[in-house]
Amino acid sequence: MTFKELYLSGQVPFEEIDRYISRWNRSDDERTLAKYLGLNADEEDVWIDDSDEALKEMLDARERVAGTPVTLGKTDIIVNKNGFGALPIQRISFDDAKVLLRKAYDAGVRFFDTARFYTDSEEKIGYALSDVREHIYIATKTAATTAEGFWKDLETSLHNLKTDYVDIYQFHNPAVCPKPGDGSGLYEAMLEAKEQGKIRFIGITNHRMSIAEEAIESGLYDTLQFPFNYLSTEREIALAKACAEHEMGFIAMKALSGGLITNSAAAYAFEAQYENVLPIWGVQREKELDEFISYIDNPPTMTDEIRALIENDRKELAGDFCRGCGYCMPVSYTHLRAHETK
C-alpha cells in the first residue's frame, strides 16, 4: 500500500512519510516520488511547492478510510475493500433497503455500485443516502447503444439517485468496446457528460475477456468491472494485474461467483491478495451485510486452511459453468419502464 492509503486508513502517523522517502532510490525525481507516495496531482504540487505540513493539512481534510484501503487507479477514489453491490436490493422494499444501506454507510462502506438496468436500485440508493452524498462514491451504468439512449439513461439515473453527478459512469456489458469515432457516439457522450460535470470518471463493465483486455489496452477507461473470484482462470486473474500496470481501477463483481462460493472469508482473503482490487458484495439481507462489515476491522487473510479450501473448490467448481449472473436471460423492460414513469 502507498503511504497515502496507510495514512488515510490510520495505519501510520504522518511522520512515517520520512521513512518512505528514505527508501526512495531516485531522490532527484520528486514527481515520481510523489506518485510512489500515492499523491494526486494537487497534493503533489502542494507537497513539492510548499511543505510537508501543507500536505498533511490537505490529507487531513479528507475523510478517513475504515479498514483496508484500495485506490481505484488514477481516480483518487480511496475506499475500503467492501463495496456495496446494489443489484439484490431490487428484491426488497424501499424501507428494508434503506436499513441495509444506512447500516453499511454507518459501518464505513463508502462505495455503492448500481445500474439503470437494476429496476429501482438507483431510487433506493437515492432514498437512503442522498443526505450523505458528499461522503460516498456512486458507480452506476448504462446499457444504451446510442447517444440518445445514453443521455436518457444518465438523466434518469441522476434523478433517481437524487444527485447532480455520478462518480463512475460505466458502459454496462457492451458487446463491443466503445471508442471515439466508432460511429455509435457513446464514448463522445461520455466525454461530454464529464465536461458538463455530470460524471467524474469513465468505466466499463463486461463478462467477455476480449473486450476487457481491449478496454485496458485502449487507455480510454478509468475503471474496469469484471467477474473476479478464486474460481477465476489465470487469464482472468491477469486482468487485475494488467489494470495495476495501466493504473486503471479494477472493480471485482461476482466475488462469490453467483452463490457458488459459500465461504465469504475465503472469498475476501483471495480478493485481499490484490491491492488494486475493489470487490463489491451483493447484499440483500442484514446478516449478509453483518458478515462483510465484520471484515472491515477483522479482514480475513490467506491461511493454509483457506488455501486448501480454495484449491478444493477450484477442482470441484472451476471451468465453464453458470455463475448465476443472469445476463444471458431474456429481458423484459416493462418493470424498468414502470419505474421510469414514476
PLM-predicted stretches and their roles:
Residues 12, 20-59:
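Amphipathic alpha-helical packing elements
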Residues 65-136:
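N-terminal binding-site loop/beta-alpha segment at the start of enzyme catalytic domains
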Residues 93-103, 148-160, 207-214, 264-267:
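Short, acidic/polar
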Residues 126-133, 158-163, 216, 241:
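Acidic (Asp/Glu)-rich catalytic clusters
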Residues 161-177:
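Active-site groove signature of glycoside hydrolases
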Residues 334-341:
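Conserved small/polar residues in nucleotide/adenosyl-binding loops
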